[in-house]
């Protein structure tokens, strides 16, 4: 009986399982920092889409997506770059994020593009990202502030507003929008 069990075990352990490896996706958002109240819903939305694709059974012959989260902080480019390097070293093939324009540019320039990792931001709007030397690896779903600022300026002109005071948050987002509006 022992020989039968041992033979069965050896036979089973040498069989090919034909299992497909997971597709590793990274989500990097400012889970801490000035927009931390927004990022849980952003991450959950991405994970919902990834789960739907996985559960369909039609993704690349039935492969599944596994997700790893990282914190961009939204404001600390060095911390965001380190977090993105961790995602890449763990084998992610694409990154959803980052959220804020400054850290998004830092991650794209220093991590994603040099490592050939596709990156798509749901919210980075800095006009500077438009001309990023990304070799086709960076995308965003939100329009550039160059467009938003121009529309706001056009509305102001159409309404014949004579005087405007501009205040803005002193970061890439605020400065980019203010510069375009002026």
Regions found by a protein language model. Name each.
Residues 4-13:
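Sec-dependent N-terminal signal peptides
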Residues 22-24, 66, 162-163:
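Residues that mark the start of a beta-strand
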Residues 69-70, 75-93, 154-158:
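Short, well-structured alpha-helical segments in soluble
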Residues 21-26, 118-122:
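Short coil-to-beta-strand
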Residues 26-47, 70-77, 99, 167-175:
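Extracytoplasmic "Venus flytrap"
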Residues 15-21:
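Sec/Tat signal peptide C-region and signal peptidase I cleavage site
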Residues 89-182:
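Extracytoplasmic ligand/sensor domains, especially the bilobed periplasmic-binding protein
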Residues 44-67:
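Signal peptide-proximal N-terminal region
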